[in-house]
Amino acid sequence: VSRGLGDVYKRQVCSMSADKTNVMRILDQKKIKYKVHEYKESGAVSGVEVAAALGQNPKRAFKTLVTVGKSGNHYVFMVPVAEELDLKKAAKCVGEKNIEMIKSKELLPLTGYIHGGCSPVGMKKFFKTVINNSVLDIDDTIFFSAGKIGFQIETMYDELKKVIRVDEADIVVE
């Protein structure tokens, strides 16, 4: 199910406030144009499977990964769902000697999100965020989690940059 942009979507959401995530409320507050795509949650599903179910190009669908550096600082990386984060490249671009993925059980207390529903928007606190530079080659919208399993946000990258500070870098495995 895909919901449209602008006022039509806002009217629909008013009658479905239970479906509205914190991410959507933040985007509304910042007057960001976006669409919400809903999919049936059927257990553990990969980002590639979600993109396929919604008919999305996996190069435009991004997963949100949370890491911790040797310094103890946390970092957020957004990579296309079919790609893998290169930990060495990622560490270098944030000035760390090395980084590692945080443990799944640490995700909720740290970000407010669970595995499979982690969004770069609306985390409990701001973390340095880097998106793979392939986003610069996309002239269309991008997709990322709406902060709840079963929901994806679609918006232009320039719109996302109005909400979070994000840098671009080559951070995927070749």
Question: What spans do the regions from the language model cover?
Answer:
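Single conserved hydrophobic/aromatic residue that forms the stacking wall/gate
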Residues: 1-12
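Extended, low-hydrophobicity, polar/charged segments
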Residues: 13-174
